[in-house]
């Protein structure tokens, strides 16, 4: 019973924390050095860092460099999240089998399901909540960076290449690039999954469309951040968690298992003939 309650408690925490972060991040007023709240001070700190990285006064360059710096710092957490998610996907068939086996709603059955599930997690070295921690750490950082671009006045000015950072891109090239890299990052993330999640498959196409249409009206500085962040994620996936290599390795292991079983059958047939 304690394990069931602990699982429920962790699920509630996982749901509440993002909501709290969202409420904190909903401020729309301008952020200055005199802003009093701790959250606004973090936003302003990010803005000053971007300004410091803006070589020759180019805020666009500052946005790119700061985004890359943040993504590099968060890379170990991202890698942990991806690996944990992959492990959870690998054991989903066995988890579903347990859920079918212990389908009852009574307390004793639920306790048994929790115990068997914990044993399965231990067997494969999986922590079902490990993928949540990196996400919860990344969320406030990414939200603060987003708000630095929208709530601090000195980041709303300047140009980068063909765009005014405070205005939307009249050529719509940045929204297109942001949508393309968003599609690639979500597609690559889902590509190596053993079992395709319907919601994730839908998001592969919905997220890029949302980014594309939102990019029509948002300041180009924000869309530039989205573009660089998702482009970095694509490169990171290909280097550290290449789905094509994962699929190839999975296929190799499947072929080896198939060959092993074939050899065993042949050996049994030979043994029977000798008798």
From Swiss-Prot:
Q: Give the highest taxon in the source lineage.
A: Bacteria
User: What are this entry's molecular-function GO terms?
Assistant: membrane insertase activity
Enumerate the UniProt keywords alphabetically. Cell membrane, Chaperone, Lipoprotein, Membrane, Palmitate, Protein transport, Signal, Transmembrane, Transmembrane helix, Transport
TM helices/strands, residue ranges? 58-78, 129-149, 171-191, 198-216, 222-240
InterPro entries in UniProt:
YidC/ALB3/OXA1/COX18, YidC/Oxa/ALB_C, YidC/YidC1/YidC2_Firmicutes, YidC_ALB_C
Q: Where is the lipid attached (S-diacylglycerol cysteine)?
A: 26
Q: Name one GO biological process term.
A: protein transport
- Give a GO cellular-component term: plasma membrane
Q: One Pfam family of this protein, by short name?
A: 60KD_IMP
Acetylation as a keyword of this entry, yes or no, is no
Key word Flavoprotein present in the record? no
Instruction: Give the bilayer topology.
Output: Multi-pass membrane protein
Q: Where is the lipid attached (N-palmitoyl cysteine)?
A: 26
Localization terms from the record? Cell membrane
Report the leader peptide range: 1-25
| Similarity comment text for this entry | Belongs to the OXA1/ALB3/YidC family. Type 2 subfamily.
Q: What exactly does this protein do?
A: Required for the insertion and/or proper folding and/or complex formation of integral membrane proteins into the membrane. Involved in integration of membrane proteins that insert both dependently and independently of the Sec translocase complex, as well as at least some lipoproteins.
Q: Which NCBIfam families match?
A: yidC_oxa1_cterm
**Sorted alphabetically, which HAMAP family does this protein's record hold?**
YidC_type2
Name under which the protein is recorded:
Membrane protein insertase YidC 1
User: Which organism was this protein described from?
Assistant: Streptococcus pyogenes serotype M1
What gene does the UniProt entry assign to this protein? yidC1
